[in-house]
Every structure is written in C-alpha cells, then in structure tokens.
C-alpha cells in the first residue's frame, strides 16, 4: 500500500462533534426559527452521527433518521431499522439513544412481536450500554419510532425542519409545522472543522497520486474510456472511491477547437499526443470529496503560446490564493484573476474560465437560500 493509502487506513473514525460544526448548526436553527430537525439525507446523517448506511441507492426511502432539538442539542436520537443495530454497535458512535423499528428484513406473513428485535442483537451488540433502551423503544414501523423520539425531546409540536421536506410532509404530524432544513444543514457544513480539513487534505493527496499514476500509464492509442478506468483503478488501490460513471476528465482544447468538453467513460476516442488535458476528477474518501486535478500536455511540454498561458495561469492561481480571505467574493476573485492575466500579457482575459471547486461531503456545501430569504 502507498503512503497515501496507509495514511487513510490508519485514520481513526472521529467522534460526534468533530465533523459536525455544532455552533453553526444551532445558529442555523435559531436563525430559521426551527425548534428541531429530523435529518434523513445519508450525508447529513453521517455528518451528525458517523453512521454510513450500506448499499442504498439515492432515490430509496431512508430507514433511519437523526432527531435533534435546538433546546437540548446534546441529546440527539437515532431512529433506525432493526437490521442496522450491529452496524451501530461496531461504530460505537456518539449517539447512544437508539430507537429501532421493525423493517423489511422481518417476514410480512408473521405478526410483529417485541421479540423480533432479538434477531439482530449479537453478542457485541448485547454488550452496548444503550441496548436496553433500544429494546424498550422497539416499534413496528418507522413513524411510530419517530413519534416517540420527537416526544422524548419535546418536539411533539413546533416548527421542525426536515432536510427532506417531502418526507416531513408525508408523515402528516399533528401540531407540527414542517419546514425545509436543507439550507440549515448546509449552513453548518459550509465551515469545516479541523477533522474535516484533515480528511479533505487526505482526499486531495489521494487524487493527486491517482492522477500521477494514470498519466504514467498513458501509451499511444489509449482512449478516454480506458483512462477513466485506469484512474478509477488507481483510486481504488489507494483506498478511495469513484462513483459510477467515474471521475470526470476535461479535455481542452482539441486542436483548434477551444470548446470545453467533458470526456468520461462514454468517450472511446484515443487521447492523442500533444493534447492539452485538464484532469477534473471526482471521488471520495470516508465520504469526503476531492474535486479537481492538474493540467497535462500528453507526452509533451507546453510550447509557444501554451507555455505563456501556463506561466500566466500559475501567476493567476498564486494571486487568487493570496486573496482568498474570509469575506472575499467569488466574483471579486475572478475579476482579480482576469486582471492578472492581462498583467501577464494575455490578450483576452475575459475568455478565461475561472471556476472554483467545492469540497466537503458534497461539492456544494452551501446554502441555496439564506435565513433571511436571500
């Protein structure tokens, strides 16, 4: 295993409150008048609890939820399908109030019984301090378990945010004003904790190593589709994960054609020597993203105008990095980048595409609408 892969393998799971920016989470609820939240989005659940569910597709209903009250945020509750009890026991996560419910693995042709929960309690799970409470709070459907959790934290009524508002509306909870909590969660996730920064640094290092290995594997005749698979293979070897259809690669330009072209596994044309490539690769480690990469002139070095633009782009990047301070606006940084291009003698800086990659549990850990409706 490489040094990057070894570092990832040795990275311990972090406790609750290390990934989660709790002060901003509470601030977001206060600003939006939320008494509490019911969180079901898998990335948000992971952010709050460290729990990463297994093998669910993105459009499937989630058999879990985190319930958190603004008035007692130190007492979150996890509502979860009974078959995940052993997963939680192995995680030894921070949420110790576990409310299981009878889920799809139990037979539909037999009547539900309180003893059904025992089918999912192995010896390590039985040793958990929270298991007696889980047994006591076992319910036969998710809504019943969720209602019990809401009652326990004083949220039988009030304004409750759901990061999946459709889920909240389908529950038809009496006395509850269901509100959208997507932006509240993104407000918290926007500012990373030190533990998150460490994960993002590791993810970026893994991406760089995978790109360098992929470049070294290029030979004449290799197609974009093959390069995509080569890159994904190196990511896997290094301990990362690439989602279907894979890491994106931008090929730009191709000869005299300056169009931005996304080349992925759907493109089976060869990568020709002399092609200017900008790798823009996506993937995750411990669910945290990397995004971006580096430029490459295939089997060559920048020449002529390309060499001038390469040097100017380095200056632009250095200038913008120095200006990236709290409060700086993306538009201001882009304008500064164009100004730097002009200072470097680039004739038409307005033709430059200056784009900023987002990093976090997603590539857009930002609000779409602020608390004041902007």
Positions of PLM-derived features:
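Active-site neighborhoods and metal-handling regions in enzymes and metal-associated proteins
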Residues: 1-374
């Amino acid at each position: 295993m490489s040094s990057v892969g070894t570092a990832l393998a040795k990275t311990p799971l972090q406790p609750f409150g290390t990934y989660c920016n709790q002060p901003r989470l509470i601030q977001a609820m206060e600003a939006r008048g939320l008494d509490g939240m019911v969180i079901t989005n898998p990335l948000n659940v992971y952010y709050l609890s460290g729990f990463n569910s297994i093998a669910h597709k993105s459009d499937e209903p989630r058999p879990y939820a985190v319930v958190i009250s603004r008035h007692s945020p130190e007492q979150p509750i996890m509502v979860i399908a009974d078959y995940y009890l052993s997963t939680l026991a192995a995680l030894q996560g921070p949420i110790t109030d576990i409310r299981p419910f009878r889920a799809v693995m139990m037979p539909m042709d037999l009547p539900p019984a309180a003893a059904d929960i025992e089918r999912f309690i192995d010896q390590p799970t039985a040793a958990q301090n929270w298991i007696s409470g889980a047994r006591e709070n076992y319910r036969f459907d998710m809504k019943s378990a969720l209602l019990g959790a809401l009652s326990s934290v004083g949220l039988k009524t009030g304004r409750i945010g759901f990061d999946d508002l459709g889920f909240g509306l389908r529950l038809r909870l009496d006395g509850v004003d269901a509100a959208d909590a997507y932006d509240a969660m993104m407000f918290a996730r926007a500012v990373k904790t030190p533990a998150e920064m460490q994960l993002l640094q590791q993810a970026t290092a893994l991406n760089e190593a995978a790109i360098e290995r992929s470049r070294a594997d290029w030979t004449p005749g290799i197609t974009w589709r093959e390069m995509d698979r080569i890159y994904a293979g190196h990511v896997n070897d290094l301990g990362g994960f690439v989602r279907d259809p894979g890491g994106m690669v931008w090929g730009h330009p191709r000869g005299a054609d300056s169009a931005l072209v996304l080349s992925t596994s759907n493109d089976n044309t060869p990568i020709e020597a002399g092609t200017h490539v900008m790798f823009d690769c996506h993937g995750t480690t411990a669910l945290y993203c990397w995004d971006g990469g580096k430029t490459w002139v295939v089997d060559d070095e920048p020449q002529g105008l390309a060499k001038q633009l390469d040097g100017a782009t380095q200056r632009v990047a250095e200038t913008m990095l120095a200006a990236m301070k709290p409060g700086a606006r993306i538009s201001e940084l882009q304008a500064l980048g164009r100004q730097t291009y002009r200072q470097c003698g680039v004739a038409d800086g307005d033709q430059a595409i200056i784009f900023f990659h987002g990093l976090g549990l997603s590539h857009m850990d930002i609000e779409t609408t602020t608390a004041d409706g902007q």
